[in-house]
Amino acid sequence: VNLIDAFGKATETNVPMTFYDKFSGDVRYNIMHTMNVKGNPDTINIDPLGSYNIVVHTVPPVSKDSIVLVPGTHNIIGIDAPQGDLVLKIDGKNDYRELKGIIRKSGEMNTIIAQDFNTSQRLIVGEYDLEILSTPRIYASNVHIDQSKTTTIQIPSPGIANFQYNNPGYGYIVQEVNNKLNLVHTLNNNATRESVVLQPGNYRVVYRPKNSQSSQYTI
């Protein structure tokens, strides 16, 4: 199986492949694509009877259907699978316990993968939209992944806002953006102290004690 890069060469490798029986849909083989000692795609021995649908588990996956093999010969199957790398990183200290970026194809809503920050992820060449699960959310549109190149998305280091109250209450954090206030976090209404990791920006807190029965006690 030749995994073809953007230049028409069989250089892509080290991804799992699944061979399905075309008619029954059963999994016939799971194989990790490998280059042999000569740097060529390794030859695999499989049953030539029947036909196969092949899925290459890149991100997102690529596939080729209705593969018919000729018995007793060296069959070559080419599948386009050009890949590059996406790195997500924070500029400085990371106060998040866990921060991920949701990756989608540009203009689509289906999630392809949730990538951890400070990691690298191989992706099929193309354009992607990112939703970073920070507070508040950060969005990046039309992020381009090129063949064998690394694209880096870096966000500013966050800060921590500490809250302490005499009594539990209803509290919300809103961000000031272009003279508008956008809700970014709901505070725990059963706690008297809380720490919230926030991206740099201007914020306001709206709070009222839980046992107060008048809006004039809003802070």
Task: List each model region and its residues.
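A short, amphipathic beta-strand motif
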Residues: 1-9, 84-93, 160-167
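Intrinsically disordered, low-complexity segments enriched in Gly and acidic/Ser/Thr residues
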Residues: 156, 161-210
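Tight coil/turn sites that cap or link beta-strands
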Residues: 49, 72-74, 148, 158, ...
